[in-house]
Amino acid sequence: MEIPVPVQPSWLRRASAPLPGLSAPGRLFDQRFGEGLLEAELAALCPTTLAPYYLRAPSVALPVAQVPTDPGHFSVLLDVKHFSPEEIAVKVVGEHVEVHARHEERPDEHGFVAREFHRRYRLPPGVDPAAVTSALSPEGVLSIQAAPASAQAPPPAAAK
């Protein structure tokens, strides 16, 4: 079963919560579209009073998406600033969330570039695939989240 998940700009849900911009890549090999956010980039989204912890140097930080391993919780943050909402597709296929983004060749600061990526994440046990939502911030951060599956109601007690 395939369930398309619409990508919505986050201002549709909460227009009063702008995020500070992420740093733009300065060199061609720094363009990590479709990869997860680095720890330092996530910290830039929070005030220092909320994140006063030690940050690893970017050379040692893992460029993987932030995916919690808590059972019944699913959340992914992806940097997709090089794509427009129309160029991004998020789908639920079985027990996986698939993200595909593609744009044709267009000019950028280094010449011309065409980009495409596919990412697939397995939903952890206890997560409802029908509850997957996604939102795109004005800065190009794609947030994909899923709520835990609702707890099954206990069987009704027999009447005495």
From Swiss-Prot:
PTM annotation: The N-terminus is blocked.
Residues the record lists as Phosphoserine modifications: S16
Domain of life assignment: Eukaryota
UniProt keyword annotations, A-Z: Chaperone, Cytoplasm, Nucleus, Phosphoprotein, Secreted, Stress response
Signal peptide: none
GO MF annotations in UniProt: protein folding chaperone; protein homodimerization activity; protein kinase binding; protein-folding chaperone binding; structural constituent of eye lens; unfolded protein binding
Subcellular location, record wording: Cytoplasm; Nucleus; Secreted
Primary localisation category: cytoplasm
SUPFAM superfamilies assigned: HSP20-like chaperones
InterPro entries cross-referenced by the UniProt entry: A-crystallin/Hsp20_dom, Alpha-crystallin/sHSP_animal, Alpha-crystallin_N, HSP20-like_chaperone
Pfam families in alphabetical order: Crystallin, HSP20
Domain sHSP: from-to ranges: 55-160
Modification Deamidated glutamine occurs at: Q66
Gene Ontology CC terms: cytoplasm; cytosol; extracellular region; mitochondrion; nuclear speck; nucleus
CDD domains with a match to the protein in the record: ACD_HspB4-5-6 (cd06478)
Alphabetical GO biological process terms: chaperone-mediated protein folding; negative regulation of apoptotic process; negative regulation of cardiac muscle cell apoptotic process; positive regulation of angiogenesis; protein refolding; response to heat
Binding partners and assembly: Homodimer. Small heat shock proteins form high molecular mass oligomers containing variable number of monomers; these oligomers display a very flexible quaternary structure easily exchanging their subunits. Heterooligomer with HSPB1; formed through oligomerization of HSPB1:HSBP6 dimers; subunit exchange leads to formation of at least two different heterooligomeric complexes, differing in variable quantities of HSPB1 and HSPB6 homodimers in addition to HSPB1:HSPB6 heterodimers.
The family this protein is said to belong to: Belongs to the small heat shock protein (HSP20) family.
Summary of the function given for this chain in its UniProt record: Small heat shock protein which functions as a molecular chaperone probably maintaining denatured proteins in a folding-competent state. Seems to have versatile functions in various biological processes. Plays a role in regulating muscle function such as smooth muscle vasorelaxation and cardiac myocyte contractility. May regulate myocardial angiogenesis implicating KDR. Overexpression mediates cardioprotection and angiogenesis after induced damage. Stabilizes monomeric YWHAZ thereby supporting YWHAZ chaperone-like activity.
Name listed for the protein in its UniProt record: Heat shock protein beta-6
